[in-house]
Amino acid sequence: MKVEEKEKVHSPLIDMKKKVRELNALAKRSKKNFDNSNYRKNDIRKNIFIYMASELQFLMLGIMLSEELTSYECFWPKWKNSPLQEEAMIKHQGDFLNSLYNGFYFLFFVQVENYLRLIANSNHINKEEEKSIMKIFRNLAKEYNLSKEDKNLFSIFSELRNLSHNGGFYSKENNKSIEFKGYKFIFEKGNSTKLPFSLIEYNVFIAEHIIDLIEKINQKTEKIDYIEDNYAKIEFTNE
């Protein structure tokens, strides 16, 4: 995912310890939602929260481990004849964090996408077996009367995920600007996507509001008794 940020990922202006605390709070919130859910075992509306908690913990632990990349006692000297120079280690820390942020974003999206598809299929909203997750979400938004802000949130979420798939922003429109919570996200063909803040701040921001959205959809689907998580059908055997 190529984006423009106000600060570099390892900028001293970003309080990373604060971001770790925020991620931990979101992971705990998701775990609490899972524990307190009234939905049955293996219902995707229950399981989605444990999946999101897992991805949030993965990101949080990755950030904590990244501190070792600029430590003279890090793993590099243990596996190399000589340690890398400090300047190189700082660059590697930035590369590591960029990869971590992108990896989290992609995996987080996969969990949410699977959740939305199962919701749509269970309620016959996806009668035409639509493949596009954006079109599926629009149908869900219409069915459950989701707000324009909800639609904008998922549009931003989806467009940034597509950058990884498509290698850039592609649309019939030359430019696309989406507003959410007072922030503007600018997508332009041939240019880096402009975020209103750094990748780690964006990850925390998007995760918080996606959790809000899923809580809302879960409430609106309470009349559906059971929506089976497709992971519950997977079996592994050893030969």
Stretch-by-stretch model annotation:
Residues L116-H124, N162-E173, E215:
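Charged/polar positions within long, soluble alpha-helices
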Residues I136-I178:
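Short, mixed-charge amphipathic alpha-helical segments
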Residues M1-L100, K148-N152, E159, N175-E239:
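Extended intrinsically disordered or low-complexity regions, especially N/C-terminal cytosolic tails and loops
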